[in-house]
Structure formats: C-alpha cells, structure tokens
C-alpha cells in the first residue's frame, strides 16, 4: 500500500486509534498542566501531566484503587468512585504545589454527566482551578451514588460510604 512518493503514512498512534493529534496539539500549546482522566473497565485514573520535549512528564497521579485506603467499599469504576478519585487527585496536586490545570479526556466521548466529568467535579471541589461548564457535570445524586442505591439493596449504604470517604480525603486537604 505505502508504495510511492505520494503516499503518506499516518503516525502509528493515529493509525492505532490511540491519539488525536489535533486535540493534543491544542492542549500542549495551552502551556498549562493537563488533568488527564482515563477510565478502564475496573478503575478511574487521573494524572497531572506536563508536555516536555523528551516526552510527557507525570507530576501527580491518583487511581480509584487507592480509595480502599480511605474506607471506600464500592466498585472502583463508577461515577462516585470517579468523583472521589478526583478529590484524591486534588489533594495530591495541592501537596505537590499545583493549583490549576486543563482537562484532557483523550478519546472519551464528551457526554454530559460522564465519569470523566465526575472526576473533574471532584478535582474542582478539592480546590483545583480547572475551566469547565456547569452543564457537563453529573448531578449531586449521581456523585453520591443514590442512583446505585435505588436499584441495588445491597448497595444501600453507598451514599454514607461516599460521604465518609469524601470527608476523609478533605481532611487530607487541610
């Protein structure tokens, strides 16, 4: 296929569908640290990343698996876990001396109320300055896990658990 001087092969990460270089260029040119939110099937990962000539440098990282240390008993890939991971990320970023960032959701679809925006809400509630619009954030009921408790009797105490963990993380902010 790539035979001849007129054929241009796209970058490898673009061919694999792993990087949107148009979006990445806009984020890197902004010259501010990026709050990178990635979701997996089991966890939410939030990182503070700066772009350098040698490659991106991660300054601070928080993973939803760390929430167990604070007493969180729910699933680590849902909306309340994303919110709490954002809070934990803000606490770590504040300790590292960072107080602002811009959101990088990567190839995630920007659906209002999505888990990536729950992590954003957690980081903003934790004291980071990140530009955003109110219409994209999930409702308070979803951040606390009331939608989970409504259909699952076993998870009825998730609202209390989320509030306890949020209080424990906010203590760390002080």
UniProtKB/Swiss-Prot annotation:
Q: Which cysteines are joined by disulfide bonds?
A: none
Describe, as the record does, how this protein assembles with itself and its partners.
Part of the 50S ribosomal subunit. Contacts the 5S and 23S rRNAs.
Indicate what this protein is called per its UniProt record. Large ribosomal subunit protein uL18
| Lineage: superkingdom | Archaea
GO function terms (MF aspect): 5S rRNA binding; structural constituent of ribosome
| Cellular component terms per the entry's GO annotation | cytosolic large ribosomal subunit
**Which family, according to UniProt?**
Belongs to the universal ribosomal protein uL18 family.
Q: What this chain does, per the record?
A: This is one of the proteins that bind and probably mediate the attachment of the 5S RNA into the large ribosomal subunit, where it forms part of the central protuberance.
Lineage of origin: Archaea, Methanobacteriati, Methanobacteriota, Stenosarchaea group, Methanomicrobia
GO BP annotations, alphabetical order: ribosomal large subunit assembly; translation
What keywords is this UniProt entry annotated with? Ribonucleoprotein, Ribosomal protein, RNA-binding, rRNA-binding
Record NCBIfam families:
PRK08569.1
Q: Which gene produces this protein?
A: rpl18
Pfam families cross-referenced by the UniProt entry:
Ribosomal_L5e (PF17144)
Read off the InterPro entries from this record.
Rbsml_uL18_euk
Which species does the entry assign this protein to? Methanoregula boonei (strain DSM 21154 / JCM 14090 / 6A8)
Give a yes or no for keyword Ribosomal protein in this entry: yes
